[in-house]
């Protein structure tokens, strides 16, 4: 009999716990934002850069903050609760910009859906970007503008891919990108990628049947994994 009472009690505890979990309210709004420098949106590799998001009042630990990934166009989004206050933390050495030694945190008070701007100071900017495709020869150029002195340029590259998500990792592979390390601040860099050796089919390392590819340029600073990029360009190629 005691064993039966014990089992019934245990069953009730499980039921009440399940009800509490079922009644847990899910986030009801997306906190949205973008990475900017003087109002200008900063482009990066898709989902490489992250910020930490947490709600004040909790001890900051891996179980109380959320890693928010930044898309290639510099935007980010995370599910939160409307009307609450949150903090966004920049992490050192994860982006192509200067580490914030004084204030690395943005406080978002009483959030109700407004677009949050995360200000950063890049080491370099890629200005006056342009790209075209003549037949199957992709040509792109940009001007290297130094924002923060003291950091060497490791490389500048042109990357061509099958879709709009294109960078130094996501591209057509061998023959689908061109890189150079002979670059100085203030210089206009022009690079070309010849696609004539690629076939047209559905594999990741071939040209798409749509007749379009995407290309953009990127710059890597020595000692920083994350690159800064131009916007992607949609280019038609000849079959």
Label for each model-derived stretch:
Residues 195-227, 239:
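Beta-strand-rich modules
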Residues 93-119:
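Structured interaction patches on ligand/partner-binding surfaces of diverse proteins
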Residues 1-41:
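Bacterial Sec-dependent N-terminal signal peptides
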Residues 57-75:
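Short, acidic Ser/Thr/Gly-rich low-complexity loop/linker segments typical of extracellular
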Residues 72-87, 92-93:
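Short Pro-Gly-centered beta-turn/loop motif in secreted/extracellular proteins
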Residues 40-61, 151-155:
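Short, ordered, surface-exposed loop/turn motifs in non-cytosolic proteins
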Residues 32-36, 139-147:
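Short edge beta-strand/loop segments characteristic of extracellular beta-sandwich folds
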Residues 74-78, 104, 114-116, 187-193:
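Short strand-edge motifs at loop-to-beta-strand transitions and within beta-strands
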């Amino acid at each position: 009999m005691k064993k039966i009472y014990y089992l019934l009690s245990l069953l009730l505890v499980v039921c009440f716990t399940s009800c509490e979990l079922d009644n847990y309210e899910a986030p009801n709004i997306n906190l949205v934002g973008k990475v900017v420098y003087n109002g200008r949106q900063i482009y990066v590799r898709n989902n490489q850069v992250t910020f930490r998001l947490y709600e004040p009042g909790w001890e900051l630990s891996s179980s109380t903050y959320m890693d928010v990934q930044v898309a290639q166009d510099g935007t980010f989004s995370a599910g939160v609760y409307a009307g609450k206050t949150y903090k966004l933390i920049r992490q050192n050495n994860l982006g192509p910009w200067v580490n914030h030694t004084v204030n690395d945190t943005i406080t978002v008070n009483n959030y109700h859906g407004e677009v949050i701007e995360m200000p950063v100071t890049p080491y370099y900017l890629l200005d006056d970007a342009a790209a075209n495709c003549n037949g199957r020869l992709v040509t792109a150029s940009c001007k290297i503008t130094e924002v923060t002195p003291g950091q060497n340029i490791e490389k500048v590259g042109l990357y061509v891919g099958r879709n709009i998500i294109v960078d130094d990792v996501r591209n057509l592979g061998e023959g689908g990108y061109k890189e150079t390390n002979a670059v100085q601040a203030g210089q206009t860099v022009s690079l070309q990628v010849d696609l004539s050796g690629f076939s047209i089919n559905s594999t990741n390392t071939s040209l798409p049947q749509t007749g379009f590819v995407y290309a953009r340029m990127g710059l890597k600073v020595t000692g920083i994994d994350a690159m800064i990029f131009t916007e992607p360009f949609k280019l038609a190629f000849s079959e």
